């Protein structure tokens, strides 16, 4: 057992149990959320047992993520102290995991037992943990999380986090388009399975947490300030990029072309890498498309 010294006095305790593998999976999904912050509780994971379920959650004040798993036992809540360390410990638990909260106010201890393994760890009280933002949906949609995440990965290269224009700092959802633009280039994906009534913009780091949903259908709720992605067990809430002037896709991306041609993306990237290997790092090459040939010229040649 890994132990933390406590005072020897009679203490009331509350206990509940969960599946160890599900608890570890939930903690792992949340580990990317806690931020390096002078506010200690923002670096940790909150655990709340209510009725027949256990909800683990974390926030950095810009993004909130919670994962709910089945549980049985008493109702209680706490915030881990050193969540990263606890997550590593939970990796070795299998079967039924029992958690027991004991101790006096401001000096509570969580005891974790699983077979012949276990430990005692200090915890924070939940009153120090920020609450989720109040949310009233103005728009609601249903889509596949994996499809949306795939689109985000395809277009995020056109996001400019250093731009002073908010609309360039995130991924825009407009009609069927999931797209991004940063002044010099735009990227668009129409395979997200959405048809958005009122455009909204979300930062890439928040959208990358969609991976926790896997290949499942989710509900998307949107209002002026936030967007929530959720299913029965997982909820992800993020602030929309504030003060973003809605960009109109049709005004940014040309709708008519003088010429169109198709190519295999993998072959094109391979050919482009070959050409770029022939130039120096300080050169600024231009790629020329001419009658099926791909050539590269330097500005000073």
Predicted ranges, named:
Residues 2-298:
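Structural preference for solvent-exposed beta-strand-turn elements
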């Amino acid at each position: 057992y890994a132990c933390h010294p406590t005072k020897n006095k009679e203490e009331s305790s509350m206990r509940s149990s969960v599946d160890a593998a599900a608890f570890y999976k939930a903690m792992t999904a949340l580990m990317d959320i806690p931020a390096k912050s002078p506010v200690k509780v923002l670096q940790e994971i909150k655990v709340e047992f209510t009725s027949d379920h256990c909800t683990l959650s974390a926030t950095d004040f810009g993004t909130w993520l919670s994962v709910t798993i089945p549980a049985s036992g008493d109702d209680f809540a706490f915030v881990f102290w050193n969540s990263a360390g606890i997550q590593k410990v939970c990796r070795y638990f299998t079967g039924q995991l029992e958690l027991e909260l004991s101790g006096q106010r401001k000096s509570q201890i969580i005891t974790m037992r699983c077979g012949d393994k276990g430990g005692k760890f200090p915890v924070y009280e939940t009153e120090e943990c920020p609450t989720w933002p109040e949310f009233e949906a103005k728009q609601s949609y249903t889509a596949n999380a994996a499809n949306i995440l795939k689109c985000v990965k395809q277009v995020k290269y056109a996001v400019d986090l250093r731009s002073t224009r908010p609309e360039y700092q995130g991924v825009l959802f407009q009609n069927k388009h999931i797209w991004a633009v940063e002044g010099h280039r735009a990227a668009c994906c129409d395979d997200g399975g959405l048809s958005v009534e009122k455009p909204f913009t979300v930062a890439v780091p928040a959208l990358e947490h969609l991976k926790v949903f896997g290949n499942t259908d989710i509900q998307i709720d949107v209002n002026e300030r936030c967007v929530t992605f959720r299913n029965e067990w997982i909820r992800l809430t993020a602030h929309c990029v504030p003060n973003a002037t809605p960009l109109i896709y049709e005004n940014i991306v040309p709708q008519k072309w003088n010429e169109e041609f198709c190519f295999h993306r993998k072959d094109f990237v391979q050919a482009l890498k070959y050409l770029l290997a022939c130039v120096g790092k300080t050169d600024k090459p231009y790629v020329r498309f001419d009658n099926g040939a791909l050539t590269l010229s330097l500005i000073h040649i």
